[in-house]
């Protein structure tokens, strides 16, 4: 296996890194502007040409109908498509072009083909969104060896420098998503305690607040129709770029000026912070909720706060967190690059564990013995690491199964709860209803209810999202009616989902393939890959 690249597939910007021969994570800058981050914007320029990055972003003001941005907010949803040149593209398709552009820039800069990757996603992403992210990588022709949470990746980047055990809060405010994660860090181990967030809260919301203020002031000064502005896609695309730039300027200046149709509109920092205070408070509320979840596991406090994500450069973020958590050190953790670097380090970590397993097998010892020997000798493992890092994660959502209650009424019962450690296996006791039954219907729903937050942990249908509803087959052969069986729900370290069925009496277990309702099929992935292989990407 060659280099394993770490990719931060962001809502507004993306980044790719690798670990060099000295064990140092290195970000590959893009070809267009030599920046470490690439705008996550896709321009379907023509039927046979797609542009990604800064040039695509510039097309928002000239060709907005053919430009797709912030697609990450839609990933994992089957009903959304972006249409260009008569073809409808699912979020996985669009995301694959961003991944393809990152890989293309690596080839241009390093002369090396990107094959094996670790891709990050928000900690608050559910199973469908994680699966869709993996599918995007497959469409791009990449071997996705792991999906890892963005805050965990940032903690890996930070944690490898930690000399003593610490409990940290990773406050990750990106361009389109927000995560807050409580993590215990010590040499050789990173343990996620609790996570929360909002995948529709990010820097774009602050941009939109500026845009709303600009349009309001413009209408007030000119008397023009507000609807005419909102209906003009070129104007709105132009404002999208200008408002993002104004947000950045307001992080270091007292005011910013935006020109709309020859009219100069001034936005002051005071106005901006007042108009977006509710957004910041929403993130603070999530930190409180996540701290409360961590407290259920005995973690009552944190030693420091790490700021991750480009939107944390807004000074009001650090100010508000200082007020909320007085006397807690607040550090910037390389907001733009730490996630991709952490993902690359995690990839190197996977290689290190494989090397350890090989050493253990050759020496006739277990892996832990080899680890201790490596620590004593100081010998550097592959990728320059002195020891592997064990990452312990949690599931970010709760999962309910549709079952009959004592009155034979179908209800949703939560069996897996948010912030449960993964990997996990959750057996659900059932029984066959007829002799030689070959299948069993299973309906699984994702939700945000925590343990004990509803009576008997029953979840209302309107508060849950259907993940899958299918006949699972084949069950073990020749089961009589009333045979006890277990449906075993499994979630792995990456937050991906599978199901087994077990004959309790006979001890036989059958693994069942699961097709999530919103997930692209292998055939659809292959068709998309073949299509994009014939399209020029730049």
Language model features with spans:
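Oxyanion-binding/catalytic loops of NTP- or PPi-dependent enzymes
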Residues: 1-77, 84-88, 104-538
């Amino acid at each position: 296996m060659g280099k394993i690249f770490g990719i931060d597939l962001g809502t507004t910007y993306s980044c790719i890194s690798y670990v060099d021969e000295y064990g140092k994570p290195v970000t590959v800058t893009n070809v267009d502007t030599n920046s470490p981050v690439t705008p996550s914007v896709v321009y379907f320029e023509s039927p046979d040409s797609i542009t990604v990055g800064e040039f695509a972003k510039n097309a928002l003001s000239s060709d907005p109908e053919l430009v797709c941005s912030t697609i990450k907010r839609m990933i994992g949803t089957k009903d959304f498509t972006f249409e260009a040149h008569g073809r409808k593209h699912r979020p996985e398709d669009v995301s694959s072009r961003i991944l393809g552009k990152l890989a293309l820039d690596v080839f241009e800069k390093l002369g090396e083909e990107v094959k094996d990757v670790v891709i990050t996603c928000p900690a608050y992403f559910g199973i469908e969104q994680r699966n869709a992210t993996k599918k995007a990588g497959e469409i791009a022709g990449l071997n996705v060896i792991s999906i890892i949470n963005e805050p965990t990746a940032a903690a890996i980047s930070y944690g490898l420098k930690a000399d003593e055990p610490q409990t940290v809060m990773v406050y990750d405010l990106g361009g389109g998503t927000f995560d807050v994660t409580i993590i215990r860090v010590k040499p050789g181990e990173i343990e996620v305690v609790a996570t929360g967030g909002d995948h529709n809260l990010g820097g774009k919301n602050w941009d939109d607040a500026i845009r709303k203020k600009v349009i309001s002031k413009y209408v007030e000064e000119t008397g023009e129709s507000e609807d005419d502005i909102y209906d003009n896609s070129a104007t709105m695309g132009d404002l999208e770029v200008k408002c993002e730039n104004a947000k950045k300027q307001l992080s270091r200046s007292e005011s910013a000026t935006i020109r709309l149709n020859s009219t100069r509109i001034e936005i002051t920092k005071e106005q901006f912070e007042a108009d977006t205070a509710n957004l910041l408070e929403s993130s603070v509320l999530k930190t409180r909720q996540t701290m409360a979840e961590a407290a259920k596991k005995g973690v009552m406090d944190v030693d420091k706060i790490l700021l991750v994500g480009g939107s944390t450069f807004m000074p009001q973020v650090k100010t508000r967190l200082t007020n909320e958590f007085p006397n807690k050190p607040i550090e910037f953790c390389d907001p733009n690059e730490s996630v991709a670097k952490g993902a690359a380090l995690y990839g190197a970590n996977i290689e290190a564990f494989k090397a350890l397993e090989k050493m253990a097998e050759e020496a006739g010892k277990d892996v832990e013995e080899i680890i201790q020997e490596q620590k004593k000798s100081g010998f550097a493992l592959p990728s320059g690491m002195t020891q592997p890092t064990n990452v312990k994660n949690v599931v970010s959502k709760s999962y309910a199964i549709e079952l009959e209650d004592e009155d034979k009424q179908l209800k949703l019962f939560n069996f897996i709860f948010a912030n449960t450690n993964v990997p996990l296996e959750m057996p659900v006791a059932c029984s066959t209803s007829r002799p030689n039954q070959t299948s069993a219907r299973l309906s699984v729903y994702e939700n945000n209810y925590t343990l004990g937050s509803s009576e008997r942990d029953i979840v209302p249908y309107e508060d849950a999202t259907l993940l899958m509803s299918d006949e699972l087959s084949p069950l073990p052969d020749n089961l009589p009616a009333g045979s006890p069986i277990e449906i075993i729900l499994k979630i792995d370290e990456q937050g991906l989902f599978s199901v087994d069925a077990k004959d309790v009496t006979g001890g036989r277990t059958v693994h069942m393939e699961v097709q999530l309702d919103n997930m692209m099929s292998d055939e659809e992935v292959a068709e998309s890959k073949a299509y994009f292989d014939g399209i020029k990407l730049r």
